[in-house]
Amino acid sequence: MTGPFIAVFTYTIKPGKLEEARKRCGELVDFVETNEPRMIAFHLFLDEEGSKLTVVQVHPDAASMEFHLQVNAKHFATAFDYLDKQLNEQYYGPMSEALAAELSKWDEPGRKLIRMPVHEAGFTRTNVR
């Protein structure tokens, strides 16, 4: 399977945990940048109230997402110290059966899930600043 794999997740932040979330997110970004050389983009966004956090990941392929899940296991184990619940998860691009099985472990009732496996058209620029 070729083509980009994009993952978008939105979480609520526990009351009183915004500063911890900011600190831990900064640490996570540094870790990902250092340890995941294939990751094309990794961005975290807060809403204006500081009550929701959205994570946007752009991978060159699904294998990069599989690697991301493996190397970030420690972060995932402690993320809900400051995050309350996941509101949605979105996946764009083809994924392997192994990745689909791994991601299904995180599925929860009531969470909005979007999977769009067919990359119809597009391009990626990596040299534009």
Which residues make up each language-model segment?
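A short, acidic, amphipathic alpha-helical segment used as a generic capping/interface helix at domain edges
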Residues: 73-77
